[in-house]
Amino acid sequence: TVGAILGSLLVSFWIIPSYGSSWAEKLLAVLAGVSAAVVMTAINQAKRRAARGSAEAPIHPSWALGVGVLAAAVLPSFPPVFLAHGRYIWWVNAQDRFPYVSEGAASTVAVHVGSDGYRNFHVSGRVEATDNPSDLRTERLIGHLSGLPHPHPESVLVVGMGGGISAGALSLYPEIKRIVICEIEPRVVGATRLFADKNYHVLDSPKVEVVFDDARHFLATTREKFDIITSDPIHPWVRGNSILFSKEYYSIVRDRLKPGGLATQWVPLYETSELAIKIQMKTFMGAFPNGTVWNTNVSGKGYDVVLVGGEQPLKIDLDDMDRRITQNQLIYDSLAEVKIHNAVELVNDYGASGPDMQAWLEGVPVNRDFSLKLEYISGLALNAGEADPIYAHMVAGHTFPNVVGNPMKVAELRRRLLGNVR
């Protein structure tokens, strides 16, 4: 029993993170040969004592050891494509590259460059970030939809490092003095650095502190409060992530916000079901009743949304947003790269608010720590392909947001939002 416990700990927390699963398999093959040789030696000795001079030749233990060594020698290395793509391995072409592959104690991490030239960041076999235009837009907006609506943010907590693109967008705001990135897997850092041209070298910013910790543990134990907390874990059906979409998690997030603070949450509408999305919305809106939904898809159809919540209803000041966009060339360029050039174009991504969705969410349960139903409900719908109808139902009762600013800008925004002009 002691050996089994020590073996599992050594393999999980030292051998695989230090040398990889391929070397772990080879080592286990050799150890199996050694174990067999030890057992055979004991058996041979027992037979010799029992036979007392019998001419029967024992099987030499070196045969067992040799088989173990041979097995280790012929075992193929674990292909990077399996670590990166999981069930989506059929996406990979022969000319694709894997400039970074690493295995940690918490997850496997890989960067895959496809034939189209775009980089894909993978964690435990699932794409978590890319630099293709549609995903880059989402990743940037997680940052900018936090930074621009807040009138004077100074401190930020980013839950989940990913490609560092959301944190990088927030690092462009001169008023933000401190950014804490909480990441459970240290091996992610190597992958994040490969996105430096898109994340503005965020890991080298003097504003940034990287904390390697479980997000729930960090939030529960830190005394620090933040103006902005962004949460961008991977899909809730992925092992261990549903707990970052629970009522208790959002309660901790709310308690760690400074007065006037904002929390943002990425929610994918693909690889899930409408019931799962309703549970996510109901849970978030339980902590932030006046939360808002923002669609990051340039076409206005369903793909990803970002939730923004705070203690008070969100007030959108178009003039202040435009001032901050136009006076900071870095922020302007960051938004322009994802086809946004001013406040009206940004707020044109607005979808709905918590009160707008009350009828849609009526009777829906919430995700709790002691009943993580979301993990299983979303996992049953990986191939559902319901993103467009989910978003349409979500915003069916939408009303015009709380917007102030130049009357001409407000009128243009009203025409776009209520006239469904993208």
Question: What would you call each of these model-derived segments?
Answer:
Residues 52-150, 155-157, 197-200, 214-223, ...:
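Soluble small-group transferase modules, centered on the S-adenosyl donor enzyme superfamily
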